Amino acid sequence: MTTEQPKDVRTATDVVLEARSVTKHFPVRRTGKDLLARRRRTVHAVDDVSLELRRGTVTALVGESGSGKSTVARLLAQLYPLTAGEIRLGGTAVKAGRGRSFRAYVRQVQLIFQDPFASLNPVHTVRYHLTRALRIHGRAGSGATELEANLAALLERVQLTPPGQYLEKFPHELSGGQRQRVAIARALAAGPQVLLADEPVSMLDVSIRLGVLNLLRDLKERLRLAILYITHDIASARYFADTTLVMYAGRIVEGGDSESVTQHPAHPYTQLLIASAPDPGRIAGQEAREETGSGEPPSLIAPPRGCRFHPRCPQAMERCRTELPPRFDLAGGRWAACWLYDTAAAPAKEETK
């Protein structure tokens, strides 16, 4: 047994995992006032999110803290039940639940957590973590010799060599980057088709982030994995991802190829994200190309009507405050959920000037 995936006759653009109108609302604990008013409040963490993860490609889901992007990853990993919508694996709707059905699902879809310091049990060695994962997923082999070969193959795959130098180490004896590589190796032990990488480099030193992203890119190409890359860093999405989706307050507001989305953003929120990113070429006092908006994200217990970005948007129209914008197709396969791209809204925009 090796950690290589079996060859597949399907093309590299096949959809492996798909979310269709996925929604997740969390109930809020009722206070005395809620009981008296007979009301139930919910957090609208994710609303009507649709996305596709394709074999051999990286899809980035970008947004600021609290946008719901990590909740999307956990929904795709079947760690939370859906409020509405469906998840399809290989074209078939799935609802993993628990027990055997959940184990069968996670063999195909693995989640890499953000914190490499918390995702590994500090009292167990690297050997224990990887051996346990191989045995759970039936990939340990038929004997001790084959198990050792499989352990070595996993560590070599994540570029921790020589393997014997790492197998007997405890997590506290590893650097942050090495721990994250062990976490990736543990995910590969299942032989998955999909990796859900939830901010995999955000807690690592800047000097080693690029190495982990390059490792994930290598795995994508060698094993033809579909990868969802969750991040708040839109610059790294441009570097690492083939496709970028931008999420704000529980909804995806823009999508397209990463180069176009990051270099020519269509949605005002994407423009705000890019304008907020550090830019060494921006001279102090230099005027921005355009006003990009300011303020804080809205409460998801009582999200705004219409477009959820309208309280912060410098280009908001009256329609934005009352009607939720659909996706408008743009050139080159891109789209944006913004009334600015509805031709019927153009006259109204002129009137508000």
Please name every model-derived segment:
Residues 77:
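Helix-to-loop junction immediately C-terminal to a conserved catalytic motif
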Residues 85-96:
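Conserved ABC transporter NBD signature motif
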Residues 189-193:
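A short, proline-enriched helix->beta-strand linker immediately N-terminal to the Walker B motif
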Residues 200, 204, 208-286:
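P-loop NTP-binding/switch modules centered on Walker-like glycine-rich loops
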Residues 36-39, 94-110, 128, 136, ...:
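ABC ATPase NBD coupling module
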Residues 170-174, 178:
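Conserved ABC ATPase signature
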Residues 3, 9-15, 29-37, 164-165, ...:
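Short catalytic/signature loops enriched in Gly
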